[in-house]
């Protein structure tokens, strides 16, 4: 028969509460990826470590409503609300993708009160790379 393993030490000494490390971040990078189907907003520090993120799907929008400008505005607001509590003051914005939520997400970021050092469009453009998908016939 196997003997039960006894645990040595008490639980009173361990720290209770959240394990999450709350960092003070003065400057960050806000990445907005706007596709036709969804908008994903990720806030990172300058080294690229993710601090907070949100998308239209996690904000409760499902189906075709995820691609709307209002869903992108809500996602940007949710992602930024978490990092404002951590003390972010300055940020740079990198927008990627052709979606409808580009401008709405940028408007929500501007309204949040964070100083934007610059806004950069980093949409990947092919130098005649892969063949695009065929045109839709509706």
Swiss-Prot record:
Transmembrane segments: none annotated. InterPro entries: Ribosomal_uS11, Ribosomal_uS11_bac-type, Ribosomal_uS11_CS, Ribosomal_uS11_sf. It is found in: Plastid, Chloroplast. Residues 1-23 are annotated as: Disordered. It comes from the Eukaryota. SUPFAM superfamilies: Translational machinery components. Keywords: Chloroplast, Plastid, Ribonucleoprotein, Ribosomal protein, RNA-binding, rRNA-binding. GO terms for biological process: translation. Its main location: plastid. Pfam families: Ribosomal_S11 (PF00411). One of its GO terms (molecular function) is structural constituent of ribosome. Gene3D superfamilies: Ribosomal protein S11. Residues 9-23 have a biased composition (Basic residues). Part of the 30S ribosomal subunit. NCBIfam families: PRK05309.1, uS11_bact. Belongs to the universal ribosomal protein uS11 family. This is Small ribosomal subunit protein uS11c. It comes from Aethionema cordifolium. The gene is rps11.
